[in-house]
């Protein structure tokens, strides 16, 4: 199974997960042209897409979904709350109602050779989820836009071979930055975003011998930067309370404006 971050950041998100027979996207929050270029970089065409799974209705996760649906008739899987939110976002354009497929929280959906589970998360959206994906041999998770993590989330994210985990902001940069007070409180709240430190603490709960690839994603342009996110998370892993601190895990930061390295698990 392959995982490719086509884009990840506060300005747009799109992640490819697939194998030889099945190709899906988690979110489509960038232009259709960028999505197609990212897919083409690994030999996949837009017409090969079997489904797009949407985490929630914020524009940085759905801005390209209308283009994809109209061009390729690709099914769109999302919770009913997310579908309602997409339907009222005028900039997305018209989407054929028949392309929408409702996925319920904690439900498993089979698409081709992949089994996808929608895991409920805490974020200021209608009915947000993150996703775990498996082909029966390998396991991956895309987990961003979480203000906090619960034991249920930890339980669902354990045992992955690859994971893209939110490391949205540095708390100090956010607090002294230019954002208005209400927005700072939103980001820092339980329905906001994971900080670098909390991403590292969550990662400590998820480490195991077979975790081959770790992406840090959804970085804020204004309140974070790649080196800081990487160093903070690595510090939490090295100094944190976990039995794997001495092991060499591959951690990389998913790029905002460029396709990241594809990983195979």
Features from the language model and the residues they span:
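Conserved beta-strand hairpin/beta-sheet module of binuclear metal-dependent hydrolase folds
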Residues: 1-42, 127-145, 162
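Active-site neighborhood of phospho(di)ester-bond hydrolases with catalytic His/Asp-centered motifs
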Residues: 26-29, 50-57, 77-80, 141-144, ...
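Active-site metal-binding motif and surrounding structural segment of the metallo-beta-lactamase
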Residues: 33-79
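Active-site environment of divalent metal-dependent phosphoester hydrolases
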Residues: 59-62, 83-85, 125-126, 148-151, ...
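Metal-dependent catalytic neighborhoods of phosphoester/phosphodiester hydrolases
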Residues: 63-72, 87-90, 224-231
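Metallo-beta-lactamase
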Residues: 80-130, 134-137
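Cap/insert and terminal regions of metallo-dependent hydrolase folds
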Residues: 151-251
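Short, basic/aromatic-enriched C-terminal tail that caps enzymatic domains
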Residues: 249-265
